[in-house]
């Protein structure tokens, strides 16, 4: 009996040892399975980090990185370079080439983009610039900036269908003359009129005087019984827009008229004024604004939205692994990318965006109409 038990014990021990050995081999087999190794993709961000654009340059850089991180699925390495002037841009480009970079996000302006175009082409580097100059676009150079004149046409067409009396409050300069001419051309076709334009110099006294003159004209129009509120088009940089806002509040101009512009008039005003502009409310359906505040960005202007979209779209189009042909096909596709700055696709290398008409009253945003 003891002999039988002894043999049974040996058999059971051998069986358990065999079972455990088979489990160990199975586990080792799982451990030794490796995923296909992917090459790390080198991406360059070329934004100003010194000079007058240093603050916004850092903000755009941080938002591009945020966008990349939010959509990344592959191995990427991001290096930031100074794009503040010609010398730094050229020096950065030498380093970008040396690192075998695949994609450059930036520069911010057309002239700096032109400086690096030929070297990028020679080294098979894709550029997605934040410039809005369509003349730059090529097969591997994409123009991602906003298009102010398209926004102007969009908002004037919309308000031209509902209002007859228009005015413009603009800084002196060639571009303002272009705005005025485009407005006149559109409004004539709609049996409306650009009745008055104030071109002001770059100082507080001139701005206050221009707003007063526009306000007086608005009063005259509002005294008529056959019209609706006049519409006033604004366009300037944030500093002067805040000076305008001070005078607009003084003369109650945002209540006696409808103030409109492109997305650049939505700045962080010291005086709250009611405005309408071309943009999108996609930002408010995300947590990007709160996260941007952690980076020290208290107001998200349209260029901030573009910077975030630039990073996120790039990572999204890279996908699981960077293949240049696939990436370029996605960039050239008419399938829109849904971004914070609108629904985006490219035609001939130039970003096209759908612009809604947004109204801001007492600090509250809402959509008037969708494109």
Swiss-Prot record:
Organism per entry: Rickettsia prowazekii (strain Madrid E)
SUPFAM superfamilies (UniProt xref): Periplasmic binding protein-like I
Gene3D superfamilies named in the record: 3.40.50.2300
The protein, known as: Uncharacterized protein RP748
CDD domains the record matches: PBP1_YraM_LppC_lipoprotein-like
Domain of life: Bacteria
